[in-house]
């Protein structure tokens, strides 16, 4: 490999902050201003060395061509019924954004209802959330530009796809809930702020409000229905009960799976919605999560983790709501996690469980909770579902590492309740029968058994010679279940690779216990679990350190950066996407304050002691041994990322280049690429996705000397 001449970057040694008596220097704090000329010059100088490096990777062209070819397969969502019509999303293959179609019947001709591709030339305007009125005649839809979390809500009459004049701004992390009379909709907005709000600003998001918009009026006339002036971090999302009588308000403070639950009986508002609603505080603490499923009169069914870390179903009668009076409808499973529940055909409940990171789907009786049927599923994930209380049918979508998607339809009016394949998609050019997926359980440092999926070509020799791509996340109660990824399958097929996904602690794979095992004081467990996954792959002969790439995004970017700092000898290549790198300051920007439930906050002395031990920015050091250098590193971020603001990766790369990159023994590249008109990832246009994965895998191939296999 070659040694690099990195840009000269100014270090402000006077930028020192006192944390509980510890003086911490932050020499690149000036990079926190995204609009300064200095920051723009830094980004330009970094991109100037990174872009040519990526473009000169011998396989980039081959990879991009193959990705474009194989990703060109049809992508469907489940059909869903609204009013008298059916709707579904469909992407012909390489469209930048998926398109919403409408049909008068399942067999009827499909017409375009909403095509986000017409809203920008480069595909960077994306649909972010939508909600149909109860009768299906109107749809509200959110649009986001350049990947920002900020949303503009517009409205359309479905008949004739006619756009209305109503426009809602200042919207972010919002609910969209119509009242059943179709007159208007609840949504969330933030107060006006100084300066811009286009996703390139870093100002913090506080004081979210719940508003009600009456169709056909100006946003300035919208009605304030709930606010929490004493609790700036609270966010309250509304939904309507199935019968339309109750507004349920779910209040969250951070990312923990806990919420308060207030409700308003609209029958107690004789003049309609005219101001702050008469909220009844059913649950007024953050000691559990309460997810509304359905109700019969005043008896409400909730999915909860209160005293049940794997979740259960309970009934609460609003006329007799004491906790001692709650009834268990479906008890907690000792091992499997209840992920979601839906009520359908008025008397059935569909329950989706996670069993050892694989989904199972069941039908239960709503009155008794009894199991009626288990739907047959291969090993994989349920990634789509539709079917509401008044529907008599359900659709569900299955995917796995080797199957792009099968949509099933089940008519619940039929005696035998047999699902049929409604749509199945195949990808030309990758024959699933050539590959195999195995799930293993490896021991972590403390002996905990961690699940990991491994995908590879059948019949490979486990001689340590294969390039491997290890992915992890490990946070926020999010489970990483099997999914179909063309870009990773190309790595397996054309780069002779082994794909591994480690289901480390911090995620939700085994309920709230698994989540709590990888947060706050236990965060190091995530890093240990991931490093032990790498050691397992090496020990079993799948790969060797010099052939191993680790990858993660967001909280997973934090994961791989920390692992590079802690064990630079264990990996050949690290790709960190939109990572959280400055653990002492993350809470000060946009929505970062919500993550303190997983990470803690440096304002607290005890939390500071945890964070300073692993914060990627504060733990970069040149390895002592002469024969150990940092792995090749590529950090990816974007100018409109207002979730993990793009100051994290620039500060981290500047630190890496300064402390490590100037050493004679550091021949592996330490690079960053900052994309423009892009954000944290949601709604990213297909064209940008293809460029990004081509960069990633070209970087891996160049750094690890991997040849292309035709």
UniProtKB/Swiss-Prot annotation:
Entry keyword set: Acetylation, Cytoplasm, Hydrolase, Protease, Serine protease
UniProt-listed GO biological process terms: proteolysis
Organism (species): Bos taurus
Cellular compartment(s): Cytoplasm
GO cellular component, one term: cytoplasm
Protein name, UniProt field: Prolyl endopeptidase
Residue numbers annotated as active site: 554 (charge relay system), 641 (charge relay system), 680 (charge relay system)
Record function comment: Cleaves peptide bonds on the C-terminal side of prolyl residues within peptides that are up to approximately 30 amino acids long.
Superkingdom: Eukaryota
InterPro entries with a match to the protein in the record: AB_hydrolase_fold, Pept_S9_AS, Pept_S9A_N, Peptidase_S9_cat, Peptidase_S9A, Prolyl_oligopep/macrocyclase
Modified-residue entries (N6-acetyllysine), positions: 157
EC numbers for this chain: 3.4.21.26
Pfam families in alphabetical order: Peptidase_S9, Peptidase_S9_N
GO MF term set: oligopeptidase activity; serine-type endopeptidase activity
Catalytic activity: Hydrolysis of Pro-|-Xaa >> Ala-|-Xaa in oligopeptides
Residues bearing PTM N-acetylmethionine: 1
Protein family according to the UniProt entry: Belongs to the peptidase S9A family.
Predominant localisation class: cytoplasm
